[in-house]
Regions:
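Structural motif
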Residues: 288-291, 433, 472-481, 521-523, ...
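Extracytoplasmic beta-rich repeat domains
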Residues: 254-256, 260-275, 288, 304-325, ...
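Membrane-embedded alpha-helical segments of integral membrane proteins
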Residues: 24-118
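Internal/C-terminal transmembrane anchor helices
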Residues: 122-147
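Loop/turn-rich, solvent-exposed surfaces of beta-rich toroidal or solenoidal domains
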Residues: 472, 497-567
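Blade-level signature of beta-propeller repeat domains, shared across WD40, Kelch, NHL, RCC1
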Residues: 560, 584-614
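Aromatic (tryptophan-biased) beta-strands that constitute blades/sheets of beta-rich domains
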Residues: 159-196, 200, 205, 211-264, ...
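Hydrophobic alpha-helical transmembrane segments in integral membrane proteins
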Residues: 138-169
Length: 614
């Protein structure tokens, strides 16, 4: 009787190869999917990885010991690895980042192993299988993230490399480095009363010793002298991203922008406010949330105000999200943890400080508090997530709290509709309007659940343009007509369009058209009916301002490039482009006269633009 060797069918590799190729191609194609790209990148990667594991377990024809052993080893390796991850991967507040990254990577590595070792002996195959799984799962210990791009790509760096913030702190700690000796608060202000600015002196950073400190007055705040800032805050004087009265030369090949200065700054997505030779912004410096003033001409630091607070989340990283607001000689700022400050614009001295989060009972919305303060007459208004809070601009006394509503990340927006001044806020599934005098609800329009990030805008006839949607739905834009009736406000929907679907990138309105980002691509729609006129130009998830006298968009890309694009409906035309700053750039650009200011979470720079010949 002769024994016959056991027959082992060949491995069925083609399904695994197909799934792995599709997974990789899907990840590469994400940028063309628009606003839905970021969540689909994570969801698609996870689903693709799990499908590969199902192939391996039930259809690969490998020995059952290898199938089950590989899955078990992968689970154990990921569990052990999770204990040693960098916090930026381990503490992904918006979701389980590590398995979302590790499962697709380990699954593709498994397919690559199966293909590469098909002709090896059983002993070598199993040894290399163990090594492949351990490396694919444990390699994440060596990495950290620098956040996530607008299309959902995780920015990976070696764990031991310093972040831009680390390098900035190391630079500031060097002897002889000029830096402002800051004012400082050890805790957020209580909700009951404004804090007295007694022990929080402002310091001129150009001084060489602490002896030059300018202490804040403990006296009752006085009404400041009325002045108008050139760029008083978020998206300009009207919060519409429009630069009026400025014409620039567009032949950048012959007259390129000239760099005035460049300097490192702390992380944060704050934009810049400008008055005279002073600019103001917010940034994170280690454990302190900082309001900083710099020279517009030279970029030198003038003063810093510090609060002992730090906000961080894995998508956008650390730092404040809101932009300072300038009004009557004061700087109003709202930090990512919810601290509202009124500072003297000249010295940085604290006038008063409040905590609207405590006052409203708002919960952390996840990506931090992002509102930029709005000053209307004698009150300053902020949005603590989806609820408005108003304070006396001089004393900090609480004036009113707005109606409750869904969470959101937009800022209060002043509009005059049918002759009535009102403050609009995008929040959750609704757009609400309140009276700036007392916070009384005037009207409300419901649409669909939304991340509520983008600011509303006015059409030429007074209609309102609003945006709804999130990274998955990308619902688009809607035009509504709001009128004051005999006893109530009436709201009529004119159209809803998917031709322009901004997610967190604000749009501008010009000559009957809206221009903005549809995902990572610029688009133009006709405001008469919402139809798309063109779509073109890939700038990532950037921002823009409009120069209406020249029919021109000044676009800052997510990669820190500046581009000039014609704001005309006939076709997409890029006029010029240059690289301005390094790093992921989500901050709004500022153009004051012929000075262009751009910043991100790593650096800030100023450029002189040539004036156009009239």
């Amino acid at each position: 009787m002769t024994s016959t060797p056991s027959f082992r069918p060949p491995l069925r590799l083609w399904p695994g190869i197909v799934l792995a190729v599709l997974l990789v191609c899907f990840q590469l194609a994400i940028p063309v999917l628009g606003p839905a790209g970021p969540p689909l990148r994570f969801l698609g990667g996870l689903v693709g990885g799990l499908l590969i594991l199902l192939w391996w377990l039930f259809f690969s024809r490998t020995p059952w010991s290898e199938r089950i052993g590989a899955i078990a080893l992968m689970a154990v390796a990921m569990l052990v690895t999770s204990r040693f991850l960098h916090i930026s991967i381990a503490d992904a507040g918006q979701g389980p980042l590590f398995p979302i990254l590790a499962i697709p990577a380990a699954s593709v590595a498994l397919v690559a192993w199966a293909v590469a070792t098909a002709g090896l002996s059983e002993r070598l195959r199993r040894a290399s299988l163990i090594a492949t799984i351990l490396v694919a799962c444990s390699a994440w210990i060596l990495l950290r993230t620098g956040g996530i791009t607008g299309d959902g790509r995780v920015e990976l760096h070696w764990r031991w490399t310093p972040s831009p913030e680390d390098r900035l702190l190391q630079l500031a700690a060097k002897p002889g480095t000029p830096a402002a000796a800051p004012t400082k608060s050890d805790a957020p202000a209580p909700a009951s009363e404004p804090t007295a600015p007694v022990d929080r002196p402002a310091v001129d950073s150009r001084a060489e010793t602490p002896a030059t400190r300018n202490p804040a007055s403990a006296a009752t705040p006085k009404e400041p002298h009325v002045t108008l800032a050139e760029w008083p805050g978020f998206r300009g004087p009207a919060r519409d991203g429009v630069v009026r009265g400025v014409r620039i030369a567009t032949e950048w090949e012959t007259s390129p922008p000239v760099q005035m200065w460049r300097r490192p700054v702390g992380p944060g997505w704050s934009s810049i406010a400008v008055h005279g030779d002073r600019l103001y912004t917010q940034e994170q410096r280690g454990g302190d949330e900082v309001v900083a003033s710099y020279s517009l001409r030279k970029g030198d630091p003038i003063w810093q105000h510090r609060d002992a607070a730090r906000f961080w989340e894995p998508t956008g990283g650390a730092g404040p999200r809101g932009t300072p607001t300038l009004s009557n000689g004061r700087v109003y700022t709202f930090g990512a943890t919810g601290i509202l400050n009124a500072l003297d614009a000249r010295t940085g001295a604290v006038v008063w400080s409040r905590n609207p989060v405590t006052d409203t009972g708002a919960e952390d919305p996840g990506w931090g508090f992002t509102s930029s303060p709005l000053v209307v007459n004698d009150i300053v208004i902020v949005a603590a997530s989806g609820r408005l809070a108003a304070y006396d601009a001089v004393t900090g006394e609480r004036r009113w709290i707005g109606p409750e509503g869904g969470a959101g990340y937009s800022s209060p927006h002043l509009m005059t509709i049918d002759g009535v001044p009102q403050v609009l806020l995008m929040r959750g599934a609704r757009t609400t309007s309140v009276s700036p005098a007392d916070g009384t609800l005037l009207w409300e329009h419901r649409w669909a659940p939304s991340a509520s990030i983008v600011q509303p805008a006015l059409a030429s006839n007074g209609d309102i343009l609003i945006v709804a949607g999130d990274a998955m739905s990308g619902l688009g834009m809607r035009r509504i007509t709001v009128r004051r009736g005999a006893g109530a406000w009436t709201i009529e929907e004119r159209w809803t369009s998917r031709g322009l679907k901004p997610f967190y990138n604000d749009f501008v309105v010009h000559k009957g058209h809206a221009f903005g980002f549809d995902g990572s691509i610029l688009a133009c729609i006709d405001l008469a009916d919402g139809s798309r006129k063109w779509k073109g130009g890939r700038y990532g998830h950037g921002q823009m301002v409009l120069l209406p006298e020249q029919d021109l968009l000044l676009v800052v890309s997510e990669e820190g490039e500046i581009a000039l694009v014609n704001a005309t409906p006939d076709r997409f035309t890029e006029v010029a482009r240059f690289k301005a700053i390094e790093g992921k750039t989500w901050n709004h650009p500022v153009l004051v006269g012929d000075v262009l200011l751009v910043r991100n979470g790593e650096e800030m720079a100023a450029f002189r633009l040539s004036r156009a010949a009239h």
